[in-house]
């Protein structure tokens, strides 16, 4: 079985990773997915291998050409050590945020597109802080919900716990981060 990349590193290239049927993977901006089959197919006269995924969030199916796996950022679930690093980021109290929502939205959108757990964690933490000060815009609320779902879903699968338990862990970490930030500002 392939080793999960460190969430701080780039996703591994197609030549480095061979996905297997039955393996859970992360499809950036879609969440945890299951590799259902890998088979040759022809689309627009081009024959190539396709990885067939079932998105666990909504049971929809997606075919990704094997040649595009790196481009779309498909990666194995993170490792336990990456979950620990994720919670360190969520709890650390360091939050960078743009003052204007356009810059903040673009920065957060770029981070969400990477699919890296650490980037998604920064988006979640950033938007949580903003939501404590003022209401999030509709688009930022949706992004916050997606970021939270992606993190909760992956943590639940990696730690083999329920999504509810994973959400509780994430909520505690976010609360801890905001408390640390407030204490630091008060000092």
Describe the function of each predicted region.
Residues 33-35:
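Conserved hydrophobic positions within beta-strands
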Residues 67, 72-187:
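Charge/polar-rich, low-complexity and marginally structured segments
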